[in-house]
Swiss-Prot record:
The gene coding this protein: mnmE
Note describing how the cofactor binds: Binds 1 potassium ion per subunit.
Annotated protein name in UniProt: tRNA modification GTPase MnmE
Species annotation: Sinorhizobium medicae (strain WSM419) (Ensifer medicae)
Annotated binding of Mg(2+), by residue: S231, T252
Family: Belongs to the TRAFAC class TrmE-Era-EngA-EngB-Septin-like GTPase superfamily. TrmE GTPase family.
Chain residues that bind GTP: 227-232, 246-252, 271-274
């Protein structure tokens, strides 16, 4: 796709900084670069140049790279200016670009959008790039690299090729059934592979829960009766003061949360109001919110300072959530606990039991040991399209007429195509590219 306008933006972080990167892309890139720096540098070679205004006043000096299209990030002529990252320097260069005819400031995600529309990236790679920029943990980085690097897209493309081959065999039987060189009932040979493909898609969908934990974090809720040590545990796990800790029961009235990194995974830790019956309006609202986050939890740490206080069933009706029973304040002489009465015996004051608790938390994280690639659907729209593809494959295997079989295989292929953006995704584009910052 050819664009008539040329866009520019600061692609690095906000100044001041040691270095700032300004990106330009579009048909007027070469002219804009020549007006700033003189003769064009060799393609894809970092060259030190003096950057000047239209009146030849010096703005700065820095490295300049020129990428003639289509061998560039966006697929069109593109350049990057690596200059000093002071506010005045960056502002002056952007003002100089703004004064040039045919140039305008880029919108959020517009460089990536041009890369997509010029066939340099597909939608899965674009989403992976957005996730890579936002990644805060090692597992988020690994998942994003798998997608932005094309590994996930290659999997879907392979499935699409198998569907295309199956359709070709069926349609060959439809169109050339009377020809001697077309074997009879050739379509029967492809159904074993179609069944295997459906199983592969189902297995892939089953891993979506792992991807959700990687992207959004494992939700761990600290629950228990008032004054059981919930806020102290939150502070100990966060290694800083998040919650107010007092000996007064009912100090925590609202749900507090903190994001942690545990064994490379993102963990969202919630501290909740003490669970008890009360007539106090504010505390009752806090308990209602506590029940709500317990219902959404992946794991509950149920705390008690007395063996008789481990009661969660009455606070989470209708849902079973994994629970770790944590005996707290065990540095005190009373009460005496039996080893069977709790899973972890903990004192946030002395640190006793913290290592065991952390080990138990890690045991609830997905086991990805030995997996160098993380091939799994990371977004709800991926899962929806995969389910549509799987359902179409089931219908194709149940159909008796060749025309219906071929049509269902076409629908399955279209569903896979919507994941990568090759089919009917125009309405999605604004949402996806809005996740990017300006300059990417």
């Amino acid at each position: 796709m050819q664009f008539t306008d040329t866009i520019y933006a600061l692609s690095s972080g906000s100044p001041p900084a040691g270095v700032a990167l300004i990106r330009v892309s579009g048909p007027a890139t070469a002219d804009a670069l020549a007006r700033l720096c003189g003769p064009l540098p060799p393609a894809r070679v970092a060259t030190l140049r003096t950057i000047r205004t239209r009146n030849s006043d010096i703005l700065d000096s820095g490295l300049v790279l020129y990428f003639p299209g289509p061998a560039s990030f966006t697929g069109e002529d593109c350049c990057e200016l690596q200059v000093h990252g002071g506010r005045a320097v960056v502002s002056a260069i952007l003002d100089e670009l703004a004064a040039m005819d045919g140039l305008r400031h880029a919108e959020a995600g517009e460089f990536a959008r041009r890369a997509f529309q010029n066939g340099k990236l597909d939608l899965v790679e674009v989403e992976g790039l957005a996730d890579l920029i936002a990644a805060e943990t090692e597992m988020q980085r690994r998942l994003a690299v798998e997608q932005s690097g094309g590994g996930q897209s290659a999997l879907y493309a392979g499935w699409a090729r198998r569907l295309t081959h199956a359709r070709a065999m069926i349609e060959a039987e439809l169109d050339f059934a009377d020809e001697d060189d077309i074997p009879g009932s050739v379509s029967a040979a492809i159904w074993t592979d179609i069944g295997r493909l459906r199983e592969e898609i189902d297995e892939h969908i089953a891993r979506a829960g792992v991807a959700e934990i990687i992207r959004d974090g494992l939700k761990i809720v600290i629950a228990g009766e008032p004054n059981a040590g919930k806020s102290s545990l939150l502070n100990a796990l966060a290694q800083r003061d998040i919650a107010i800790v007092t000996e007064i029961a009912g100090t925590t009235r609202d749900v507090l949360s903190v994001d942690l990194s545990l064994a490379g995974f993102s963990v969202k830790l919630f501290d909740t109001a003490g669970l008890r019956e009360t007539d106090e309006v504010v505390e009752r609202e806090g308990i209602r919110r506590a029940r709500q986050v317990i219902a959404d939890a992946d794991l509950v740490l149920l705390l008690s300072e007395k063996p008789s206080d481990f009661r969660l069933d009455e606070w989470q009706p209708g849902k079973s959530v994994p629970v770790i029973r944590v005996a707290t304040k065990v540095d005190r002489p009373m009460p005496r606990w039996k080893t069977s009465e709790a899973d972890v015996f903990l004192s946030t004051r002395t640190g006793e039991g913290m290592d065991k608790l952390l080990a138990m938390l890690q045991a609830h994280l997905p086991d990805l040991a030995g997996n160098t690639a993380l091939s799994m659907p990371s977004r709800r729209r991926h899962v929806d399209c995969l389910r549509q593809a799987g359902a179409a494959l089931v219908r194709s295997m149940e159909a008796r007429e060749l025309e219906l079989q071929a049509e269902q295989l076409r629908q399955a292929g279209d569903a896979l195509g919507r994941i990568t953006g090759r089919v009917d995704v125009e309405k999605l584009l604004d949402v996806i590219f809005s996740e990017f910052c300006i300059g990417k």
